[in-house]
A protein has these predicted regions:
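Phosphate-end processing signature that detects enzymes handling 5′-triphosphorylated RNA
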Residues: 1-253
């Protein structure tokens, strides 16, 4: 889709903050270093795919050198013309590689049935379809949060996001309805992410040090699994890659 970035390669650093730390940091960041992007505070909805026994996230939380996630993502209030992103996110030796396509809710339903979408990168569509066909995954966890995103005034490639009110559910597994859910963490921390295409500027390191903000390995989906899902019995149902009588991919919802 024109105007939508479909490939990313960057380093992402994560930090767990209190609300007081986040407010103080925001004041400093917006005092000449960064600006809030055009969307302001907005809701992000994610639908994570996994196996029935959560094999992908169980492997991921072991912190291997290579890990991968497949998810759907939507920004803001869901409407019929809302863009839905299908994303394959890989991390290797600390570098994040993300490949994605975008479409309307109806487009995404067709894509998940195995159709190819007009106007989207055909190579990326093949990569995503191949991954879905080779792995027995289906929608498992809906995860939402409120985000404020900032970009660097000198280096627009520098991105900082602050996410709050992290919540999840394992019912109504789509990105097209409400964003209700149960808090992942009872203390409701703020998750700061610094996304870098280049080296981190010195002023940012100094600000983080000033506010006693230190890097963490926090994973939203991983924390959700450990706090709420790890002791559940596997829910065995047909996989997203299984085919119906017409030979089309049947998306389990």
């Amino acid at each position: 889709m024109a105007g939508v970035q479909c490939s990313f390669e960057r380093v992402e650093k994560k930090f767990v903050l209190t609300h007081a730390q986040a407010e103080a940091l925001m004041r400093d960041l917006t005092a000449g270093y960064m600006a809030v992007d055009q969307y302001g505070q907005h809701t992000i909805r994610n639908l994570y795919y996994d196996t029935d026994d959560y094999a992908l996230i169980r492997k991921s939380i072991q912190r291997p050198k290579y890990k991968v996630k497949f998810r759907l993502r939507a920004y803001g209030t869901p409407m019929e013309d809302t863009l839905i992103f299908a994303e394959l996110k890989k991390k290797y030796s600390g570098v994040v590689y993300k490949r994605r396509i975008a479409g309307s809710p109806d487009d995404m339903r067709r894509f998940l049935r195995g159709e190819t979408l007009d106007g989207e990168n055909p190579q990326i569509q093949r990569e995503l379809h191949r991954y879905l066909s080779e792995h027995p995954i289906r929608p498992k966890v809906f995860l939402a949060y409120e985000r404020v995103a900032l970009y660097g005034l000198e280096d627009p490639e520098l991105r900082v996001t602050l996410d709050t009110h992290l919540r999840y559910r394992t019912t109504r597994l789509d990105c097209f309805t409400d964003d209700a859910g149960t808090l992942i963490c009872p203390d409701d921390p703020v998750i700061l992410e610094v996304k870098l295409a280049n080296a981190a500027p010195l002023w940012l390191a100094r600000l983080l040090s000033r506010h006693k903000i230190y890097m963490s390995s926090f994973s939203k989906y991983g924390t959700c699994y450990l706090n709420h899902l790890a002791r559940r019995k596997p829910d065995i149902r047909p996989m997203a890659h299984e085919r119906n009588n017409e030979g089309e991919i049947e998306h389990a919802s």
